[in-house]
């Protein structure tokens, strides 16, 4: 576990922003917890994929943040990017709804669930909790990940400008309470969660994908190509 959970796993830009977190007491406890969990039970994602979101989207490249909750708990689903699944894996219900809204909004139809190309374009696909015990949603909540991802969000709020934060659901909104005091620096898009339980309460019809590209165009930044390869 040790090699997979060191700061040198991250791009240099994230190392610079998060280096003080690695020495915090909560991180020491989190490392011990993860070492125990990975050695005694099945945990997702694989150790090498825990920090895929940060590896894929360096700090200075972040243009959009889409916050998730915790990884998918099913075999072969989680690979370190929120809402995403590896190539060839059946689409989970929330991702089906995300793609449904994308098609309604921009006429783009995606059939593969791997969102890596979004991450490569500057969309940080970050879960609030980065690991989960197999078959048990939220099983790694309250172990320290929330503090770590709070630090990620805080660094973006404080040290970057004109980032578009996409908050789907109450958990994401609560996570970004700080944003509502710094909205002059950043853009905020909110909607209900895309899960089947909530999507009909306002996620469908939110038009977030076109709104993101409209905001990027206003900032003279390249728009996101939402069509997956």
UniProtKB/Swiss-Prot annotation:
It is found in: Cytoplasm. Keywords: Cytoplasm, DNA damage, DNA repair, Hydrolase. One of its GO terms (cellular component) is cytoplasm. Coiled coil: none annotated. It comes from the Bacteria. Its EC number is 3.2.2.27. The keyword Cytoplasm applies. GO terms for molecular function: uracil DNA N-glycosylase activity. The active site is at 70 (proton acceptor). CDD domains: UDG-F1-like. PROSITE patterns: U_DNA_GLYCOSYLASE. InterPro entries: UDG_fam1, Ura-DNA_Glyclase_AS, Uracil-DNA_glycosylase-like, Uracil-DNA_glycosylase-like_sf. GO terms for biological process: base-excision repair, AP site formation via deaminated base removal. It holds the Pfam family UDG. It catalyses: Hydrolyzes single-stranded DNA or mismatched double-stranded DNA and polynucleotides, releasing free uracil. Belongs to the uracil-DNA glycosylase (UDG) superfamily. UNG family. Excises uracil residues from the DNA which can arise as a result of misincorporation of dUMP residues by DNA polymerase or due to deamination of cytosine. This is Uracil-DNA glycosylase.
